[in-house]
Amino acid sequence: IAWITPNDLSGNENKMFISHGERDITRSGLDNSSAVLMPKHSLLLSTRAPIGYLAISNNEICTNQGFKSIVPNAGYHGYFIYYLLKRNVSAIAQQGVGTTFKEVSKDTLSNFAVPLPSKILANNFAEKVTPLCEKRCVLEEENRELERLRDWLMPMLMNGQARVE
């Protein structure tokens, strides 16, 4: 099961989606911890060390305590919530408290007020951006696959195990 930490999003700033992190958690590890399995399309907002990384899960995932995960419901579409959070991430980060590491608590995030449009307007927005976001998801996954292929092939080319003709 994919285990996502804020560190996994540190190189993900220009990406909207995430499917895997550096590590995984086993079913046993999940069952014997306070971790929760989050559904596909959950929004992941890092709320400590550092505050403000944001992504949408491409599959079921678990996160560490550095995140507040949001599961969109019937009220507002997930893509609308994503862009709403993205627009307000600096203001959310300013709400962080702590001496060693700043953190935004669940209560602080729950009470963070933003003006909301009507659900009709928000749904119209989501209707327009959904095809674009879905295409972006496909392109990001293709880029990740190309990066994996490059990382596998480059050492082989460098040490002579493979040649390009």
Which residue ranges define each predicted feature?
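DNA target-recognition domains and sequence-specific DNA-contacting regions of bacterial/archaeal
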Residues: 1-116
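Amphipathic alpha-helical coiled-coil/heptad-repeat segments
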Residues: 75-76, 80-83, 87-91, 95-102, ...
